[in-house]
Amino acid sequence: MRKGLFASLVTLVCLGVVMVSCNGDIDEDIDEGMVFAVNGQEPVFTYKDFDAIPQDYEEITNGTWKIKKVNGLVRQVSFCTDGVDAAPSPAPPMTEEEFFKEFMPVTADNQMVFYDRDYRDDPHYLQYYKGVPVEQGFWHFYFHEDGTMHGGDGRFIPIGQLDVNPSVNMATARKIVENFIDGSVEGEGKRIYLSIMSFPENGELKPRLVYVYKRQVWEEGEFIYVDAQTGRVLYHLGYMGGAPY
């Protein structure tokens, strides 16, 4: 069974936090030359490439605060480690916006955007870069009944400069995926959308603009990532029962 860094994507999918957008304009002309050029090629990356990325874990304590980081980025924060009824010290951020400014390298282009609230009325945020959803970029907050922020967890993907204008149109990407799976991208539980996903490059993860094909029926499905600039299939992930294969 495949495990490691990239396997976490399956967990995010099952939690329903992976972002999706529309299927795009299917009336666009297909670039048959590009489709032919990439047809039959194996995906650029395997799960071993993702598992080879170093993971540096760090835990910081400050008063009642406990902050967990992975590769220098905050992944989990608890402001009340002394118990639910204890007063946090130092005082936690008053709002989600204050939290993001303090703990994450958000920019005018790279933002956390409110998504919804769960059954406890705690807010969930999803990450967007220049209006394009970022795979695995999300944050969940937890609040006390009095409105005090208790903590949160999630993931923020730093992105410097990235061209979000695809060279490959949606129709061409759909055809590339259909050739790869030898089937249709139409049907229940299937969709394809433009997004941003990080892939291995020189020992670290670097974001790329991609088309994501998602097929999900209950706990079984697959993902295919197509480079939105070159048309190459970058990665293929299948999962069943929440576990990748």
Residue ranges and their predicted role:
Residues L5-F6, V177:
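Sequence-pattern detector for short linear motifs
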Residues G4-L5, L12-V44:
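Bacterial Sec-dependent N-terminal signal peptides
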Residues I30-Y245:
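Segments that shape or occlude catalytic/ligand-binding pockets
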